Amino acid sequence: LRVDANNHTVTMLVQINGRFLTDDTRHGIVFKDGSNGHKSLFMAYATPKAFYEALKEAGGTPGENMTMDNKETTHVTGSKLDISVNWQGAAKAYSFDEVIVDSNGKKLDMRFGGNLTAAEEKKTGCLVCLDSCPVGIVSNATYTYGAVEKRGEVKFKGNASVLPADNTLATVTFKITE
């Protein structure tokens, strides 16, 4: 993980999981050794604790508003993040909206939710979830928990027309915008 406190950014190394260029997932980025490590579009080399601490060091404020009880009715809060993805040979750094397809065409609203205690208890390795989540360090305020798997309100997958092949290494940069 690379932290640039002056520019309020955190950059991490990830690997593309090509399965989710065709299959749906609610898992954006997960630590490769977590129990959900192979369920995400991007497999990361950073732990939830390291990622949480890096976002705080970069100036982020965790929302800490998500619980197991309120998750299906609550939208995650916390510092707003612009997320971009780059890799060797990429035409440019692509925004998260460009690399992740939302079946409803809605924009992602990525927030530093926090949730370090739950993350350490559950050991899923979840870093970035595509709906509001009480475990992931960062998640998407556009949808509440259960929107993908339980209620079928939306489907997410990687944008195969933009992203490189399975196993390609990439960097993901999180910029704190508010």
Ranges and model annotations:
Residues 1-178:
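Long, low-hydrophobicity ectodomains and other hydrophilic envelope-associated domains
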